[in-house]
Swiss-Prot record:
Family membership noted in the UniProt record: Belongs to the P-Pant transferase superfamily. AcpS family.
Keyword Cytoplasm: yes
GO BP annotations, alphabetical order: fatty acid biosynthetic process
Localization terms from the record: Cytoplasm
Organism superkingdom: Bacteria
The protein's name in its UniProt record: Holo-[acyl-carrier-protein] synthase
UniProt keyword Membrane present: no
Organism this protein belongs to: Clostridium botulinum (strain Alaska E43 / Type E3)
Protein keywords: Cytoplasm, Fatty acid biosynthesis, Fatty acid metabolism, Lipid biosynthesis, Lipid metabolism, Magnesium, Metal-binding, Transferase
């Protein structure tokens, strides 16, 4: 059963400017594992924007936006084939009673925008 669907679109240039103007931007919104992935991708603004959009999409699929939690509670990584995967903090497991669920995300981008979709399925 589908519990929620979320989508978000981000202007890559806006994220690029935020990174350039705020040295703490990446550390403030992304986990250590996400930052390790960004290093492998040479801190590509498209990649960072895609992850940002994915976090927003997941928050919308949860049905609350970012009420009571933050971007660091949602971690977007890649599996061995490059497919994006989501890890949630223990706080979110408890907050949304997500014991038996799957989260599916898709991330894409053009030269100017990054977009992400998230679907939460209850098993």
């Amino acid at each position: 059963m589908i519990k929620g669907i979320g989508t978000d679109i981000v202007e890559i240039e806006r994220i690029k400017k935020a990174i350039e103007s705020n040295p703490n931007f990446i550390n403030r919104f992304f986990t250590e594992k996400e930052i390790e992935y960004f290093k492998l991708r040479k801190f590509n603004a498209n990649t960072i924007s895609g992850n940002f959009a994915a976090k927003e999409a997941v928050s919308k699929a949860l049905g609350s936006g970012f009420r009571g939690f933050g971007l660091m509670d949602i971690e977007v990584l890649r599996d061995e084939l490059g497919k994006p995967i989501v890890n949630l903090s223990d706080k979110l497991y408890k907050m949304f009673n997500l014991d038996n669920y799957n989260i599916f995300i898709s991330i894409s981008h053009s030269n100017t925008d990054a977009i992400a979709y998230a679907i939460i399925e209850v098993i």
